[in-house]
Amino acid sequence: MARTAKRYKKNTEKKIPGIPVCMAAIYVRLSVDSDEKKSESIETQVTLIKEFIQKHNENPDKEYEIAVYDIYSDLGKTGTNFDRPGFERMMNDVRAGKINCILVKDFSRFGRNYIETDNYLEKILPFMKVRFISVCDNYDSFAPDAKNQELSMNLSLIHI
């Protein structure tokens, strides 16, 4: 009787695919302006994003699951530049391969400088294979219609 190599058996076994897990960073930011609304508070942003994650994970038709790696926050920091301790710590974790998904309440919490924000969303994060989700803007960078959603990003970043 001929021997069958194990490698051939592995190729014929039917594999049951698991649901991929996105290791996510929750990023929240609040500048200290007198006109900041209560709806923008750090706690409110975190709660909103966690509710989104819970609802997403409960969906039986989901293509991936979201697991929170850490919460990164910048209190009292402007969104017009990216020189923020919480943001830099998050990006260090992205570079270390600990995170492959970033969730924010809306684009303006990520950054208000259109050019730099666009650079992150269009070049840096895609190059690093990092999914970006803006909850209130209904934006997911891995969605098929992500390119069509850029207009809402452009409008929400206008700082008057």
Question: Model-flagged regions — what are they?
Answer:
Residues M1-I158:
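Short, structured surface patches at the beginning of a domain
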